[in-house]
Amino acid sequence: FLPLLAGLAANFLPTIICKISYKC
């Protein structure tokens, strides 16, 4: 469960940073 969660975080984190900083 934890590796899956880490994988999800690794997938969504760049998108979140992109939306916050508007640097895509």
From Swiss-Prot:
Tissues expressing this chain: Expressed by the skin glands.
Highest taxon of the lineage: Eukaryota
InterPro entries: Antimicrobial_frog_1
GO BP terms in the entry: defense response to bacterium
Localisation: Secreted
Family assignment from sequence similarity: Belongs to the frog skin active peptide (FSAP) family. Brevinin subfamily.
Role noted for this protein: Has a non-hemolytic activity. Has a broad spectrum of activity against both Gram-positive and Gram-negative bacteria, fungi and protozoa.
Name of the protein in its database record: Gaegurin-6
Phylogenetic classification of the source organism: Eukaryota, Metazoa, Chordata, Craniata, Vertebrata
Gene: GGN6
